[in-house]
Amino acid sequence: LGTGEDAFRQIFGDTNFSFIAGGVKFVCLNTNAMEYDYSEPIPDFDYIERQLTERADEFNKTVFCMHARPLCDQFNMAKVFQMYVRQFPGLQFCTVAHEHRISASDVFDDGVMYYGSNCMKNRSYLVFTIKPDGYDYEVVEF
């Protein structure tokens, strides 16, 4: 149909966005490179770079959220992406969902964890608790 991005923007807004809650910056990114014809950068490194300094005095921890994880078929420039991600203060973890299964993986063997969530038809989701000295997560099945 070719209207996926238009529908997404109409319902949710920008495909890249961030917010800060409790001193944690959540950077939410479009990583579905195969959905585009290379007319725009996916992931958008200029956007990621701006997030490093934008409102920098308001956060000391960072979480990245995306659909496709680095090194999967949908993701471009994985190693460059990881270099950017590692620059952020107090990087906690990254969340992904493209594979529709629960997973926990240190994709680059550098200590940065990527947690995959299931699809709703499999009736589970992840809950993260970010603490002063780290974080916990649990799988909730319903």
Predicted regions and their residues:
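Extended active-site neighborhood of metal-dependent phosphoesterases/phosphodiesterases
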Residues: 1-61, 80-93, 101-138
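Active-site segments of SGNH/GDSL-like serine hydrolases
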Residues: 60-70
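Short, solvent-exposed aromatic-acidic interface loops
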Residues: 65, 138-142
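Histidine-centered divalent metal-coordination motifs
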Residues: 67, 97-100
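Short, solvent-exposed loop/turn segments at secondary-structure junctions
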Residues: 72-74
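Sequence context surrounding c-type heme c attachment/ligation sites in exported
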Residues: 77
